[in-house]
Amino acid sequence: MAVQTLTHENLNDTINNNDIVLIDFWAPWCGPCKMQGPILDKLVETVSEKATIAKLDVDQFPAPASQFGVRGIPTLILFKDGDVAQTLVGVQQEGTLLSAIEAALK
């Protein structure tokens, strides 16, 4: 399974129709965001049965970033049962993200 690409049209459905969702708010010009991408690609292989991993381009879809208080990118927001469980700002390593997902599953 691959990292899903979200738009303003499928964002709410993705959050509300999955138990655990990790969304990377990013932009194509952002150097740290480019570093985060391969980490998420690797993470999705590990957690695809437990969580949905997705990304949303804040340049194309600024409203959701504003809605969730994203002020810097990359920002990763972990949702559990449709609610924000954790917000992580800056590049996050796979172990940190895996720990956050595992904690949300408890």
Residue ranges and their predicted role:
Residues 34-47:
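Typically the conserved alpha-helix immediately C-terminal to a functionally engaged Cys/Sec
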Residues 3-20, 62:
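A short beta-strand-turn-helix
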Residues 22-23, 53, 76:
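Hydrophobic beta-strand anchors of alpha/beta hydrolase catalytic cores
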Residues 19, 26-29, 72:
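Short pre-active-site segment immediately N-terminal to redox-active cysteine/selenocysteine motifs
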Residues 62, 68-77:
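Structural micro-motif
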Residues 2, 26, 52-54:
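Conserved Rossmann-like nucleotide-binding pocket used by diverse enzymes
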Residues 80-106:
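Non-catalytic, surface beta->alpha helical segment in thiol-disulfide oxidoreductase systems
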Residues 57-59:
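Conserved acidic residues
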